[in-house]
Structure formats: structure tokens, C-alpha cells
Amino acid sequence: MGNRTHEYYIRLVEEDYFGSVARQDMAGILACFTEDARVTIYHGDNEPRRFSGQTDPDAAPLHTFFDHLLANYDPYFDDFTHFVDAENDRCAAYFKVRLTPKASSPYAASGTLNLRNCNFFECRDGKFHNMTLYYVNPDAANMAGPAPTGFPKAN
């Protein structure tokens, strides 16, 4: 059972994790995850994408998700609603994301993305052990150029 507070998890999610993503601080981002963390991303009808902190034949290295995101976008997060189960080391966040493509990004012509995300976090030792991310891109049908997915495409 968990020994961390409701406030701890809100700070971990909103300030430590998403704050580090917004600052493009890779060390800060990865510090929020256990060494063997797993991340699964669901986007519409696309196949789920999986990332792992350890070598896993069914998942890409965890850092590659953030490498892609930070190389292509300036992210901004707001309008958080948190759900915390501190007793069981779990939390969830529903929030808005604004991804502004960098000029050098192949997604630059697509313009700024405004997404709604919901992330579910299972924690261990005060860090994310399993993160499941669902996001919706309501503007995708009206986009020109390559449709950004927010994560690397399979090779």
C-alpha cells in the first residue's frame, strides 16, 4: 500500500513530469519513471505503441518517445483534472495539450495541435512504473501534410 499523499501524486504528474516535458528536460522526464517502466499509447484506431525503460522485444526504448516529441514540438499542458488513489499508488490526469511544431519538424505544415489526453499512472517507489496514455486529436481530419501522431512511426 502507498505511503505518499494525494498532493505528492499531483506534483509528480503536473510539475515533475509534465513540467519537465514542457521545459524539454529529458533527465527530469526520465527521473519520473522506474528503470523498468512501461508506457503504452493509444491514439484513435491506430495500433497501440509501447515503450519500455528496459530492453523489450515488444517495445521501443522509453527515451525514443520523448526524443521524437521534443525534437518536433514545443509542448504546453494545462487544464488538469486529477484522480488520485494514493493508497494504491495510482493516479490519472485528464488535461489539454498544445503541441506547436518546431520549424525544422516534418510536421511544421500541420500547424499547432490541440489535444485532449488522459493518462493513467501506476507507481512504484514514488515513480511511474506503468503509464497508459489515451489522446484525441480533434483537428486531425482537417490537417494538411503528414498527420502527426506524437510518437515515432514504426520502421
Predicted regions and their residues:
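Short, low-complexity N-terminal intrinsically disordered segments enriched in polar/charged residues
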Residues: 1-35, 149-155
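A beta-strand edge to alpha-helix "cap/lid" segment located at domain peripheries
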Residues: 2-5, 70-155
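Short, contiguous strand/loop micro-motifs
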Residues: 4, 13, 52-53, 105
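Hydrophobic pocket/interface hotspot
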Residues: 17, 29-30, 37, 62, ...
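A solvent-exposed, acidic/Ser-Thr-rich amphipathic alpha-helical stretch
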Residues: 7-9, 26-28, 34-88
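Hydrophobic alpha-helical core bundles mediating ligand binding, dimerization, or RNAP-core interactions
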Residues: 14-17, 21, 33, 62, ...
